[in-house]
Amino acid sequence: MGIPKIAGYPLPTPAEFPDNRTGWTIDPDQAVLLIHDMQEYFVNYYQPDSSPVVDIIQHIQRLKAAAKKAGIPVIYTAQPANQHPTDRALLTDFWGPGLNGDHVPIVEALSPEEGDIEYVKWRYSAFKKTPLLEFMRAQGKSQLIISGIYGHIGILSTTLDAFMLDIQPFVIGDAIADFTREDHLRTLEYVASRSGSVKRLDEALDEIRSQKPLTLEQIQQDVATSLGIQPDEVDLDEDLMFVGLDSMRAMVLVEKWHQQGENISFGQLMEAASLREWWLVIEQARNEEQTMAVA
């Protein structure tokens, strides 16, 4: 009973990645990044300072950095310590009593940062007994980028649940780890052929970074996300101060839009009151930039 000690193994090579049955691509506007169960307790079953765990930590760091730059929400799951037998239920029959008070935190190299979301996880799937689905529905998100451990247990269960909830799951095949290399490869094969899309890290990064031009609808979505409300609650002609948008949130939004290629300043936006007026400022800045480029 319990989790076995895990021998090191090399991550799958690009040639070993399975062909996907779908042609899905990651849309940064629709995606959420899940960092699944990267707690000291689970990571410590791997051999320290060796593949796959050292490699996937580095890969998840890169994935998270790209996601945050693209404005993709980052969600962590972590199991609690000292679970009551009633809460743990059937998991005890397979894995014992679970975590004690030690080694519960996320590994230091992947520690959650300000703005990241943390959910307590009780079952294999990240959707069970957590607010993950409600969050994604409220934010209008339809894609889940999945990283972490263990591949054939929680990663696969979460992928299957996402698929059956009409959410496109993307498993980053070299940003997950498993009990064995064979388990790892079987997980990727199953996902690619039955329930989701398997991506290499480099593929995922390219898709995350290939952002579409900013639209009025995306501005509305970004403001709603910043305020923790739904997009239809942000009227295009309402004064944004009355909705609750303060200067700090506005500065964060301006920085996000800078990263998407918009040449606007915080001062310019503050001279406008509503979303529709903000959009006019952005369009004017685009026109001026095009005029200067032609000249």
From Swiss-Prot:
Q: In which pathway does it act?
A: Siderophore biosynthesis; vulnibactin biosynthesis
Record text on cofactor binding = Binds 1 phosphopantetheine covalently.
Needed cofactors, names only, are: pantetheine 4'-phosphate
Q: What is its EC number?
A: 3.3.2.1
Q: Where is the signal peptide?
A: none
Q: Which InterPro entries match?
A: ACP-like_sf, Isochorismatase, Isochorismatase-like_dom, Isochorismatase-like_hydrls, Isochorismatase-like_sf, PP-bd_ACP
Q: Report domain Carrier positions.
A: 207-286
Q: Which residues carry this modification: O-(pantetheine 4'-phosphoryl)serine?
A: S247
- Disulfide bridge map: none
Is Iron-sulfur given among the entry's keywords? Answer: no
- Region Disordered: what ranges? 1-21
Q: Which UniProt keywords apply?
A: Hydrolase, Phosphopantetheine, Phosphoprotein
Q: Which GO terms describe its molecular function?
A: isochorismatase activity
Q: Does the keyword Phosphoprotein apply?
A: yes
Which transformation does this protein catalyse, written as a reaction? isochorismate + H2O = (2S,3S)-2,3-dihydroxy-2,3-dihydrobenzoate + pyruvate
Q: Which Pfam families does this chain map to? A: Isochorismatase (PF00857), PP-binding (PF00550)
Q: Give the protein's biological function.
A: Involved in the biosynthesis of the catechol siderophore vulnibactin. Vulnibactin is a chelating compound involved in transporting iron from the bacterial environment into the cell cytoplasm.
Its recorded name reads Probable isochorismatase
Please tell me the species this chain comes from.
Answer: Vibrio vulnificus (strain CMCP6)
**Gene encoding it?**
venB
